């Protein structure tokens, strides 16, 4: 029984988003044992994330400028948010905590991937003005980077910004921005549809 539980928890930690929806659905089952098992597993997942996040927050308090701890905490919160476990009051506060951590990380690391993660959160929360600031900054710092250009494209599509997309197409052609074949095909298919 203990081994079975340990294996199940290991699977849940490896792919929580795939399993959380099933566990939440199982909580509505008519079988009391299934409901109990699903509830216990969800509680265990919450506990695991909470403990990990709290430990990392404590470490960060002791070493506030440690980029590795900050990255681990960002990843833990990112995983927690993606898991589907966040609900209620945490549904609003967790993304804000994540944004605050990403802002801190951007100030220390100045890496494109962190700006894109921050921009992704602004996009998800519908914070267009802040997203625009991120895109403008990346345009100055990394205008030729494929990762930036793909994110810029995704943001423009998500916002339904036709004028922005026209400028995007013109800019990547003028600058001759390298895009992988896969990304080029996706962008070209959208261009044809527009």
Regions from the PLM with identified roles:
Residues 32, 36, 43, 62-85, ...:
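Amphipathic alpha-helical repeat scaffolds of TPR domains
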Residues 7-8, 23, 43, 57, ...:
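Conserved small-residue packing positions in alpha-helical repeats and bundles
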Residues 3-4, 15, 70, 77, ...:
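TPR repeat positional signature
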Residues 1, 21-31, 59-61, 105, ...:
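Alpha-solenoid HEAT/Armadillo-like helical repeat scaffolds in large eukaryotic proteins
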Residues 81-194:
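Long, non-transmembrane cytosolic or organellar matrix-exposed soluble domains/tails
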Residues 3-14, 25, 36-44, 117-121, ...:
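Structural detector for internal amphipathic alpha-helices that build alpha-solenoid repeat scaffolds
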Residues 16-27, 50-55, 114, 128-134:
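Amphipathic alpha-helical scaffolding segments comprising HEAT/armadillo-like alpha-solenoid repeats
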Residues 2, 27-34, 66, 111, ...:
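Short inter-helical turns and helix N-cap capping residues of alpha-solenoid HEAT/ARM repeat scaffolds
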């Amino acid at each position: 029984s203990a081994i079975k539980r340990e294996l199940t928890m290991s699977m849940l930690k490896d792919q929580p988003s795939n399993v959380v929806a099933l566990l939440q659905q199982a909580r509505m089952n008519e079988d009391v044992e299934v409901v109990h098992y699903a509830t216990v597993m969800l509680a265990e997942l919450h506990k695991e994330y909470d403990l990990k996040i709290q430990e990392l927050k404590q470490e960060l308090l002791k070493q506030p400028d440690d980029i590795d701890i900050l990255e681990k905490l960002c990843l833990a919160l990112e995983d927690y948010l993606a898991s589907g476990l966040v609900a209620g009051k945490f549904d609003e506060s967790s993304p804000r905590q994540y944004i605050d951590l990403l802002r801190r990380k951007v100030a220390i690391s100045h890496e494109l991937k962190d700006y894109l993660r921050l921009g992704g959160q602004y996009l998800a929360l519908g914070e267009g003005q802040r997203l625009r600031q991120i895109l403008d900054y990346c345009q100055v710092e990394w205008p030729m980077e494929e990762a930036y250009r793909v994110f810029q494209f995704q943001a423009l599509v998500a916002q339904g910004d036709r004028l922005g997309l026209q400028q995007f197409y013109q800019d990547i052609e003028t600058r001759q921005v390298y895009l992988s074949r896969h990304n080029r095909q996706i962008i070209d298919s959208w261009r044809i549809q527009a």
